[in-house]
Amino acid sequence: VTLTRGDLVGYVERDLDADLARWFPGRTPVAVPEQTRPVAPFLGRLAPADAAALAAFDRRVRSGRMPQFLDIYSWSYGFDFAANGCGIRDSDYETELTDEDVYSIGADGGGNLYVVLTTGQIGIWFHEEEVVEEGTRFDDLDVFVWSVVRYQAVRAGVLERAAVEADFLSLGQDGVLEPELGLLHSMK
């Protein structure tokens, strides 16, 4: 059976906790300061399904119980771009975005941030160019989190690449398939 985006709607709320417990039981839990930028104002800019996924993710991040799997720290979750003097440009390298247009949910290990856009897409904000690149995107948070959890499980040696590769291909996400930056490339 081919996995579709529709199959993953509600993943963060429904299945994330079980997957994290299965593959990452001993990992240190995420801890962000109480004063971390609130997500509530951003939720109103999202479609209902995207807002539900981000709200569910935020509850887990702030619970102090979610295992670390996405470089979620005080500097990467709810990052305040303006207060830190950082610009944000869309993939056309011209359209200026603001903190109202994105919400950062973690880092990639190289100083780049994963951001939720008001379209519901997830992209990578590259710190050197201060741009959210087009070829790095995921259609929504449920698909992104599902993909990153499995990517990290493969990297940790608790899941075989062959067990997820067909699903990654069927979902057709740029953030997985991009030849140089995609998750599949990084699993080699």
Language-model region placement:
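A surface-exposed partner-binding patch
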Residues: 1-113, 176-188
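Generic alpha-helical structural element
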Residues: 8-9, 46, 130-133, 169
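Solvent-exposed, non-transmembrane amphipathic alpha-helical segments
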Residues: 74-77, 125, 161-168
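Compact, glycine/acidic-enriched structural inserts
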Residues: 123-159
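Acidic, proline/glycine-rich low-complexity IDRs
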Residues: 149-188
